[in-house]
C-alpha cells in the first residue's frame, strides 16, 4: 500500500516538486508530511461522502489511486456519478467494477513506478483555475474544525478532546484507534505526519483492537 515507508518517501519526493492535491484514506494517514501539508493536503475520506476531500475527488480531472484498497472506501461512494478518470499504481491489478474502471494501471513495485514518473512530471504546474479552486477548498478544510462548538453542559465536544490528544503526541508516537463513533472523528481530524502511526481497523472493523495494538 501507499503507507509503506519507501512508497511514502517517493510520494513526498513528487509532492516536493509538483504541488499536486492529495486526499488520504484512513489507512493512508500520515503520508503527507508536516512541511507539505499546507500546499498538498486536503483531508481524509471514508465511510461518508461529505468531506472536502470528496469534493476534490468529484472535481478532479484525474484521480491517481496509489495502493488503493476498495474495502476502505468503495468507489461507488466517491465516484457515484461514474465520471472520474482514474489511474492505478499498485502491486496487483485493480478490482474493476462499474464505479472503478482505471484508464491505465502501473502494476509492479510502487516505489519504482513513482520514481520513474518523477522526471516526467517534474516542473508541471496546475492550471490557474485549478489553483484558485484549491485555495477555496483549502479554506473549507481549515474552517471545518473552527465552527462554534457549544456542547451541552457537562459534556465535551469531540474536537476539543482531539485537540487535547493532539497536544500530548508528537510525530513519532503511534496512536491506535478503536471502533465506534469516535473512530470517524479521529480519522477525519486527528493529524498524523508519519505513515502507520495512526492505526484504524477498516473492513471488518474489529471491536477492541486498539488495546492489543497498543500492547
PLM segments and residue spans:
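Short glycine-rich anion-binding loops that position phosphate/pyrophosphate groups of nucleotides
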Residues: 1-3, 28, 68-71, 180-182
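Active-site diphosphate/adenylate-binding microenvironment
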Residues: 8-11, 138-214
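Short, solvent-exposed amphipathic alpha-helical segments in soluble enzyme
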Residues: 8-19, 78-83, 104-105, 189-194
